[in-house]
């Protein structure tokens, strides 16, 4: 009888071990977006960038992204600047109060700026004219967040700048020296919806290989 119990116990042990092995194999893994055609980035120095900021920002546009691997949002921006602030390579962006991305930027210490190829102009247009409050813009556009240093860039980008916030300040009625700009950009349905200016130190520059 003891032999029967020993044999049964051995069979149960083998069955349990096999089940655990299968579970280990099929257990969902924490996935980081991977595609060989858009994931090959290398790090360069900021001064090695060959951008013309006037054409890249004003005409080419870029995506500002904040959040992390679990949750993030991005939006198209055509106002901003690149330069040096407090002795650091820096980027300046402007975000209106009602944008979903602003909530992510305010909640984190870092954000990214991503420049995409011209072929993504349609997607950039969508990202700028729709809000993350109304749905998943990543899914709607077919773009993908690219986790980097605790924040997210855009996987399809040619260039990603990882920035750490140094300063933020909200524009208001008192900051305008040219009243015509306030009337043009902050009147009608945008009355009171002023931009917040963020200046971020550029901590990393990634370019597609």
Where are these regions (language model features)?
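Intrinsic-disorder-associated, low-complexity terminal segments enriched in Asp/Asn/His/Tyr and depleted
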Residues: 2, 11-13, 33, 37
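Intrinsically disordered, low-complexity segments enriched in serine/proline and basic residues
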Residues: 9-10, 18
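Short, Lys/Arg-enriched N-terminal segments with co-localized hydrophobic residues
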Residues: 17-38
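Basic, polyanion-binding surface patches
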Residues: 34-209
């Amino acid at each position: 009888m003891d032999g029967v119990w020993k044999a049964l116990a051995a069979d149960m042990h083998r069955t349990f071990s096999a089940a655990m092995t299968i579970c280990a194999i099929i257990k969902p893994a924490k996935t980081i977006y991977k595609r060989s055609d858009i994931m090959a980035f290398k790090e360069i120095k900021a001064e090695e960038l060959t951008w013309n900021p006037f054409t890249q920002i004003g005409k080419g546009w870029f995506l500002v992204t904040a959040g992390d691997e679990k949750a993030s949002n991005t939006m198209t921006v055509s106002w901003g600047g690149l330069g040096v602030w407090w002795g650091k390579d820096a980027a300046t962006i402007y975000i209106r109060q009602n944008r979903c991305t602003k909530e992510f930027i305010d909640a984190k210490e870092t954000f990214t700026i991503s420049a995409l190829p011209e072929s993504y102009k349609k997607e950039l247009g969508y990202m700028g004219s729709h809000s993350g409050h109304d749905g998943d813009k990543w899914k709607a556009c077919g773009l993908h967040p690219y986790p980097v240093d605790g924040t997210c860039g855009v996987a399809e980008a040619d260039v990603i700048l990882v920035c750490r916030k140094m300063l933020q300040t909200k524009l208001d009625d008192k900051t305008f020296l040219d009243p015509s700009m306030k009337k043009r950009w902050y009147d009608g349905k945008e009355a009171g919806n002023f931009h917040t200016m963020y200046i971020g130190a550029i901590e990393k520059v990634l370019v597609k290989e």
